[in-house]
């Protein structure tokens, strides 16, 4: 593995094992990242099995070509450089209309966070960027410097759930009227200066939620996840499974809701039984999310907020 793309995979065995791998099946890793899940999944496949791996970051794909070389050489893995919201169209273009399982590791990968110039981290000084796909035009700089006060408040509340959203948006408006806000450090200081002394004493970095909100907005993370997970459930063969790792309450709430909608049915009044065409297409494999073990939590700080939800196609 290349040194500049080091990544400790979260819930590695749980995520893949819960897919109940069929050696000759067709599988998808919707979030290739450091290729940890892909590597373990490929190790479970026989010569007739195949993995399709998505990532919109070329660096991740370049790294995976090296890490997964033996599977590349046997033709068992196909890399797709695109946002996973285009899951269905990419697979259908490759002649794939049905899959046996798919896994998601949502959020930003550790290498992206650690790469200073990507501008994801409030801990390192860097240009405001936060794009997972470097080819897209919208950046964190654009959000911070061009969004109206009301739009900033909206995304800070909606995606950051920060109770100081109005104060932070107002302060951003004041500062950018003098000169553009161009670095992560500048933004982090503005956020800190907008919060009360009592709030600043709380555990965790005061800029964390706002940086999360801007990152979600720049990459339309929740919209992409919503579209992709729905497509994934439609692509699953009967008995196929979907595993989703989330890292914050918004992702987890979305996943839980999508799984609930697909695994329950509103029975019209007066119907003595549920007709076949109204039966749910999915069932929950685990009602409560699977959490990392104590051993994993001690070994990998990033695992602390991780939750794994799994569902199975039943018709």
Swiss-Prot record:
Gene Ontology MF, one: rRNA (cytosine-N4-)-methyltransferase activity
Cross-referenced Gene3D superfamilies: Putative methyltransferase TM0872, insert domain, Vaccinia Virus protein VP39
Catalytic EC class: transferase
Keyword S-adenosyl-L-methionine: yes
Entry keyword rRNA processing: yes
Keywords: Cytoplasm, Methyltransferase, rRNA processing, S-adenosyl-L-methionine, Transferase
Main function: Specifically methylates the N4 position of cytidine in position 1402 (C1402) of 16S rRNA.
Name of the molecule in the record: Ribosomal RNA small subunit methyltransferase H
Species of the source: Streptococcus agalactiae serotype III (strain NEM316)
The gene coding this protein: rsmH
């Amino acid at each position: 593995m290349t040194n500049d793309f080091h990544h400790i995979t979260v819930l590695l065995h749980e995520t893949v094992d819960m897919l109940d791998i069929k050696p000759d099946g067709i599988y998808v890793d919707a979030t290739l990242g450091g290729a940890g899940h892909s590597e373990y999944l490929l190790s479970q496949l026989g010569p007739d099995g195949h993995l399709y791996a998505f990532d919109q970051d070329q660096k991740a794909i370049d790294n995976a070509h090296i890490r997964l070389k033996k599977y590349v050489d046997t033709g068992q893995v196909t890399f797709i450089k695109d946002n996973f919201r285009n899951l269905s169209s990419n697979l259908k273009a490759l002649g794939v209309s049905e899959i046996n399982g798919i896994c998601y590791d949502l959020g930003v990968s550790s290498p992206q966070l650690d790469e200073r110039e990507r501008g994801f981290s409030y801990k390192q000084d860097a240009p405001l960027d936060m794009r997972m796909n470097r080819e897209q035009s919208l950046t964190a700089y654009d959000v911070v410097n061009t969004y109206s006060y009301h739009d900033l408040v909206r995304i800070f509340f909606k995606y950051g759930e920060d109770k100081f959203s109005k104060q932070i948006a107002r302060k951003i408006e004041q500062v950018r009227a003098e000169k553009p806000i161009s670095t992560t450090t500048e933004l982090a200081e503005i956020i800190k200066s907008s919060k009360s002394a009592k709030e600043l004493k709380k555990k965790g970095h005061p800029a964390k939620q706002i940086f999360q909100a801007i990152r979600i907005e720049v990459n339309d993370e929740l919209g992409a996840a919503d579209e992709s997970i729905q497509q994934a459930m439609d692509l699953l063969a009967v008995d196929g499974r979907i595993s989703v790792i989330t890292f914050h309450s918004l992702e987890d709430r979305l996943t839980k809701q999508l799984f609930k909608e697909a695994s329950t049915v509103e029975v019209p009044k007066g119907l003595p039984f549920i007709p076949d065409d109204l039966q749910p297409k999915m069932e929950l494999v685990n009602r409560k999310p699977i959490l990392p073990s104590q051993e994993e939590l001690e070994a990998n700080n990033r695992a602390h907020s991780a939750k794994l939800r799994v569902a199975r196609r039943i018709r």
